[in-house]
């Protein structure tokens, strides 16, 4: 267990949640939404309602159960060790696979200043170096990594908040309305196409609860950080992407590789574009620290319960799962190097997409877990949280429906493989014969 001086307070963990949510995607969102048009504002409204509902689910369940591990801990408590094991493996995979995709984007922004980074071999080596830097910072301790991420998130917020607040001085209503709906679809179809982009934008809402073991006063701070992080991300997303849609004509915005950079150059000149690239790189690379932290924490929580190899639960004097973090570093390095060829890179793109779906399954389990764990503990808020949970359910399922068929298929295959792995894990940790004569209780 982490010592009190190593634990982190409310502001750093809130910024970690916001940084993990926004990550790299925020800087490309306006270009991705340009294929739909200004009507995307309605998609944002639907998405934010769903994301806030999900954040309130995590906030409430973490106030009832502050066990470290987040979704893993809730699934295990509500549904038993099998779904706990499944949740941990899915989430652990999603965290470190997502890091590999994120570091490539972050280093890509740095290529604005160092063109040599566009060379595949140099890019790969640089990515590996950054991955290990953040593994090392995590080993130093959670307080160090949250400080680094707080600085990185603050830097990333400079162009986002700048455009969100001051971009409106260059906003043209006619530019925005001229591309109100360029999707070729009706109103409902256009909003649905927007949701396929925006629903993914709040992945990371759960990260404060996963890191509960390293947070001071988790029953108070985790719920506040969860909802606060979502609200910060929501305001940044809507104001900045809407402002850019009114600054840059739709035809140009669709082709933009750096919408925030283009908007900054339009408003303040070329130097501003360089500043945006630097801030974007900081935001992407800084979020690596937070995702590495939660990957290590969910694995440690499961290992402590006998549902993951014991090595992931070994900690140093500060309570840091050093061995688990080193294993993460090795796995990320292997995958990073193996994705250097064009064919492998294409396959890894599929793996990255599948890993995002991996996070939705724990979300669904957590929604169900709240209604089970909260049974008899929600008082006069029962109806309120049933409604909130249903909204969060729809949010997650809609995100899965909007995914590609191939991604969903491989996610299902992974679930089947994890089922087989669980039997081996059970036999490894239980030396006695399976209790065939044990009575099965109703409701269990």
Curated annotation (Swiss-Prot):
InterPro entries: AA/rel_permease1 (IPR002293), APC_superfamily (IPR050367). It catalyses: agmatine(in) + L-arginine(out) = agmatine(out) + L-arginine(in). The record marks 291 as: Middle gate. The record marks 91, 206, 363 as: Cytoplasmic (distal) gate. It is found in: Cell inner membrane. Agmatine binds at residues 21, 94-95, 99, 203, 291. L-arginine binds at residues 21, 24, 94, 200, 203, 355. Each subunit has 12 transmembrane (TM) helices; TM1 and TM6 are interrupted by short non-helical Gly-rich loops in the middle of their transmembrane spans. Each subunit has a central cavity which binds substrate. This is Arginine/agmatine antiporter. It comes from Yersinia pestis. The gene is adiC.
């Amino acid at each position: 267990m982490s010592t009190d001086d190593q634990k982190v307070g409310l502001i750093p963990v809130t910024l970690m949640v916001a940084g993990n949510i926004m990550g790299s995607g925020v800087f490309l969102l306006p270009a991705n939404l340009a294929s739909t048009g200004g009507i995307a504002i309605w998609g944002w409204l639907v998405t934010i309602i769903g994301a806030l509902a999900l954040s309130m689910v995590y906030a409430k369940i973490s106030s009832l159960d502050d066990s470290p591990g987040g979704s893993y801990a809730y699934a295990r408590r509500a549904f038993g060790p099998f779904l706990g094991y499944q949740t941990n493996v899915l989430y652990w995979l999603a965290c470190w696979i997502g890091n590999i995709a994120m570091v490539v984007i972050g280093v890509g922004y740095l290529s604005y200043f160092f063109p040599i980074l566009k060379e595949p071999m140099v890019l790969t080596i640089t990515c590996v170096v950054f991955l290990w830097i953040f593994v090392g910072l995590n080993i130093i301790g959670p307080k160090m990594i949250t400080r680094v991420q707080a600085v990185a998130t603050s830097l990333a917020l400079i162009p986002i908040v700048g455009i969100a607040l001051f971009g409106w001085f260059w906003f043209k209503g006619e530019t925005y309305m001229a591309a109100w709906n360029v999707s070729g679809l009706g109103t409902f179809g256009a909003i649905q196409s927007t949701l396929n982009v925006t629903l993914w934008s709040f992945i990371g809402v759960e990260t404060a609860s996963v890191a509960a073991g390293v947070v001071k006063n988790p029953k108070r701070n985790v719920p506040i950080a969860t909802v606060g992080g979502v609200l910060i991300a929501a305001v940044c997303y809507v104001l900045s992407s809407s402002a850019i849609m009114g600054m840059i004509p739709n035809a140009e915005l669709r082709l933009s590789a750096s919408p925030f950079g283009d908007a900054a150059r339009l408003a303040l000149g070329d130097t501003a574009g360089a500043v945006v690239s630097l801030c974007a790189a900081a935001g992407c690379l800084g979020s690596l620290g937070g995702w590495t932290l939660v990957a290590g924490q969910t694995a440690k929580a499961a290992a402590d319960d006998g549902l993951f190899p014991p090595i992931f639960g070994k900690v140093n004097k500060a309570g840091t799962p050093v061995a688990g973090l080193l294993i993460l570093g090795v796995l990320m390095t292997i995958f990073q190097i193996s994705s250097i060829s064009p064919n492998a890179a294409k396959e890894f793109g599929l793996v990255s997409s599948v890993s995002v779906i991996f996070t939705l399954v724990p979300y669904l389990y957590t929604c169900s877990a709240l209604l089970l764990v909260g049974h008899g503990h929600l008082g006069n808020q029962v109806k309120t949280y049933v409604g909130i949970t249903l909204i969060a359910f729809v949010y997650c399922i809609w995100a899965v429906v909007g995914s590609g068929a191939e991604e969903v298929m491989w996610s299902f295959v992974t679930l089947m493989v994890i089922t087989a792995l669980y039997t081996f894990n059970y036999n490894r940790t239980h030396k006695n014969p399976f209790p065939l004569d044990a009575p099965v209780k109703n409701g269990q």
